[in-house]
From Swiss-Prot:
Induction: By salt stress, in stems and leaves (at protein level). Follow a circadian regulation with higher levels in the light. This is S-adenosylmethionine synthase 1. It is an enzyme of class 2 (transferase). Pfam families: S-AdoMet_synt_C, S-AdoMet_synt_M, S-AdoMet_synt_N.
């Protein structure tokens, strides 16, 4: 590749599990998991908000499950590491408010006919449009800028919890800028331009120690050496002080980190959040199947990069539209790829739930609620399974 090649910079960010918005996502999904574990037909729309010494869960839940919401809130906070006021929240002594009502009967009869409908007849839980995206620039078929930002956040938590960096506290943010080359519509990462980490810390540590530890224990194990050079810029706790964090530092809300949850600013987003929603909510199940479709297209060699959009009307099972764009990287025309996608994937919400096994609780959704819903190597992330697509390579 010539040195004078045209490149551009693209940035993705992430936050780790102690960020107040992410804390809320995890509580909402922990509630969903608990409901589905006892009653797979649970209808859940659970929101969470938090501020100093307070967590509130609110929303609409119709379930046969017997769920202790307060216990789930405290356990989730505890597991993240919010065990005292000085780290941002005290799981055992904070105030927990619960305002949960039943799903509106108007919505219930329109979506699932009060549970009288067969799975293929279940309508979408709401209107909306969702996107799935995939790119061949990483083994996960995800954007590199997003993958690196996400892995830095996960690694920050790992070295906090295993004691490698005892000065760390739960809250933290990461951001990675990658220099790319556009190869006829496909994205080719050349180098990491900038790495930014802002992490909550205790009073004992100096900024120099923070920078040294982050380079050695967080950045080095995560970012492959081939992407770093002498020109790579590092901003490590650039504000100079981040002792107050978690809900004490900022208020948190479910559904405020939807780009971090998906593709780090690549592709597109229909605006609907994931956490705290059961699979009849197409904001979640639609985005999951759209990712599976896009990933399968790239994995099959049909394209190097791809976006899939689907849209729904409330109460209607079939999608209103399906759209595929391969950014000019398709081996066959996009309209032919679209035909293959429509033949291979069942976009009806009830069938998505069955085909991707989305009615299973446990800690399944809690796992998705931090460090991204896509590109994860975990059997519970069923939408990451590539479906084989039948197509003929065009004759040269």
């Amino acid at each position: 590749m010539a040195a004078a090649v045209d490149t551009f910079l693209f940035t993705s960010e992430s936050v780790n599990e102690g960020h107040p918005d992410k804390l809320c996502d995890q509580i909402s999904d922990a509630v969903l998991d608990a409901c589905l574990a006892q009653d797979p037909e649970s209808k859940v729309a659970c929101e969470t908000c938090t501020k100093t010494n307070l967590v509130m869960v609110f929303g609409e839940i119709t379930t046969k499950a017997n769920v202790d919401y307060e216990k789930i809130v405290r356990q989730t906070c505890r597991d993240i590491g919010f065990v005292s006021a000085d780290v941002g929240l005290d799981a055992d002594n904070c105030k927990v408010l619960v305002y949960i009502e039943q799903q509106s009967p108007d919505i219930a009869q329109g979506v699932h006919g009060h549970l009288s409908r067969r799975p293929e007849e279940i309508g979408a839980g709401d209107q909306g449009h969702m996107f799935g995206y995939a790119t061949d620039e990483t083994p996960e078929l995800m954007p590199l800028s997003h993958v690196l930002a996400t892995k830095l956040g996960a690694r920050l938590t790992e070295v906090r919890k295993n004691g490698t960096c005892p000065w760390l506290r739960p809250d933290g943010k990461t951001q990675v800028t990658v220099e790319y080359y556009n190869e006829n519509g496909a994205m080719v990462p050349i180098r990491v331009h900038t790495v930014l980490i802002s992490t909550q810390h205790d009073e004992t540590v100096t900024n120099d120690e923070i920078a040294a530890d982050l380079k050695e224990h967080v950045i080095k194990p995560v970012i492959p050496e081939k992407y770093l050079d002498e020109k790579t810029i590092f901003h490590l706790n650039p504000s100079g002080r981040f002792v107050i964090g978690g809900p004490h530092g900022d208020a948190g809300l479910t559904g405020r980190k939807i780009i971090i949850d998906t593709y780090g600013g690549w592709g597109a987003h229909g605006g609907g959040a994931f956490s705290g929603k059961d699979p009849t909510k197409v904001d979640r199940s639609g985005a999951y199947i759209a990712r599976q479709a896009a990933k399968s297209i790239v994995a099959a060699g049909l394209a190097r990069r791809c976006i899939v959009q689907i849209s729904y009307a409330i109460g209607v099972p079939e999608p209103l539209s399906v759209f595929v764009d391969t950014y000019g990287t398709g081996k066959i025309p996009d309209k032919e790829i679209l035909k293959i996608v429509k033949e291979t994937f069942d976009f009806r919400p009830g069938m998505i739930a069955i085909n991707l096994d989305l009615l299973k609780g446990g800690s399944r959704y809690l796992k998705t609620a931090a460090y991204g819903h896509f590109g994860r190597d975990d059997a519970d992330f069923t939408w990451e399974t590539v479906k084989p697509l039948k197509w003929e390579k065009p004759q040269a």
